[in-house]
Amino acid sequence: MPPGGSGQGGCPRRPPALAGPLPPPPPPPPLPLLLGLLLLLGAAEGARVSSSLSTTHHVHHFHSKHGTVPIAINRMPFLTRSGHAGTTYIFGKGGALITYTWPPNDRPSTRMDRLAVGFSTHQRSAVLVRVDSASGLGDYLQLHIDQGTVGVIFNVGTDDITIDEPNAIVSDGKYHVVRFTRSGGNATLQVDSWPVNERYPAGNFDNERLAIARQRIPYRLGRVVDEWLLDKGRQLTIFNSQAAIKIGGRDQGRPFQGQVSGLYYNGLKVLALAAESDPNVRTEGHLRLVGEGPSVLLSAETTATTLLADMATTIMETTTTMATTTTRRGRSPTMRDSTTQNTDDLLVASAECPSDDEDLEECEPSTGGELILPIITEDSLDPPPVATRSPFVPPPPTFYPFLTGVGATQDTLPPPAARRPSSGGPCQAERDDSDCEEPVEASGFASGEVFDSSLPPTDDEDFYTTFPLVTDRTTLLSPRKPAPRPNLRTDGATGAPGVLLAPSAPAPNLPAGKMNHRDPLQPLLENPPLGPGVPTAFEPRRPPPLRPGVTSVPGFPRLPTANPTGPGERGPPGAVEVIRESSSTTGMVVGIVAAAALCILILLYAMYKYRNRDEGSYQVDQSRNYISNSAQSNGAVVKEKAPAAPKTPSKAKKNKDKEYYV
């Protein structure tokens, strides 16, 4: 068979094998190298879209079939993306208005404000947001568009302060994000990724020097100096009694046309509240709700789900973490700000008039409101370090938890005017519990005096005879739905001593500094022994047949307790006030009496010594007269020696002897 032919079925002959092994195929690139390349690409993409505000990249992961790949995500792409950012409303050509109104008792007065909003429009002049104070005060804040640029104007009592961004044109129909912050008279404004504009009024530079100089100004001249500084134009800092937020500018004659998304003001999501038909929000005009999406402001501890531009089938969870609210300028509030207002920003959570601002002369406080209690702890099973043991006296037929502070005496009970008879009251056994809950409140800010709208005026001297001088005011709130608690232990407050622990049941809002005693107050303590380290234990027992007892200390006489309901009759259960024992009152009285007695003794002793000193002087004068009379027994001698009369007796005797011998 010739070479190269087919043999055995025509199979072609295999070429002869070459000497030596074949080279191996090239190895695939290592997996760490691929991961490193993807990481660099992701970091470059994140750096490309970063802005001046974003100084930190947060590494996040997305999962795929090839493993976990870290990607650097920046928070700015979400703010500059043209999609929906929070609840979005479209304002039509006819104009529209969304108004959020604070209740009269919950109007805040703030020293710092934060505003953030996203919008798109083709208008060159319009009003987006305006915040007004109560009528008569004149404080306001307004975000507007003027000549296609964004500006803010506000007034907190002195002059109008303006800040704008002339370089950013926002009337191009694109989506823009505006952030505004105010601290006193200072303000910052940022549009999209443009640098932050800062505004510092000239009047604020003197505040530090004023604070230093005020320490040397006499107290009686403080008000005069303040009035003089006010006349000189010192910048005020508090936005007083904010009443309403208005979005749309229809009431200002410059209506906005376009879309507004995810508006935040001091933690309030006004557009979200409008979409939820909140009773405090009113809408009018040509307004249409678009929907909700990712939030405008990526805040702390929030997770946003978004679609990557280069991976349409991959969902990545992103979490953006921010630093504290005071280290960066011009950034938006966090989620904690949207739920709980910071205590340094919120000065007064009511319609009361702040005392550190001068433009509140026409402000009239109203009743009711919310009182912020800085030291309130919930029920706990741990015993307090120092407490008193007192029996629990519940009203039949249910048991109420009774919480005490640190000590109580009979002189700390409320006056008779603070309690009312149970007959005809709203809190009967057959009435609903909701009609009976009017809790007494505690305040860590006040001077320790209890106020009641039903009591006589505080300038009455007789009114204060039943109140001790105490430092802290403590109260007890009655629960809305009482549950049997036969054995209850409470944890001591972590703040100032004497602050009472309040149950976790919500209480009605009352204004700061106001007390509301509408339930009759009954003492529920009976002879507890005092001693450190003794935990508070409560045991259920039936009320005594006679009048309720009061706490007494060994060595002190028992004083009658004011009981308007009469002996053997108890008022309805309600708020009970317990104030810590103040032994300094008794010591002060004893000290005053002792000091008065000592002063009287010193005065009597001084009078006695002065009287004795006068009698001695009189005797000395008599002795001198006696010597002079003895010298006058010889008339001739007196005539001859008249100038020698005031001389000493020895000299006179010597002259007499000499004359005798002559």
Curated annotation (Swiss-Prot):
The chain crosses the membrane at residues 587-607. The lineage of its organism: Eukaryota, Metazoa, Chordata, Craniata, Vertebrata. Its main location: membrane. Residues 1-46 form the signal peptide. Interacts (via cytoplasmic C-terminal region) with CASK. Isoform Beta 4b binds alpha-dystroglycan and neuroligins NLGN1, NLGN2 and NLGN3. Interacts with CBLN1, CBLN2 and, less avidly, with CBLN4. Interacts with CLSTN3. Brain (neuronal synapse). This is Neurexin-2-beta. Residues 1-10 have a biased composition (Gly residues). PANTHER family: NEUREXIN-2, PIKACHURIN-LIKE PROTEIN. Glycans are attached at N186, S350. Belongs to the neurexin family.
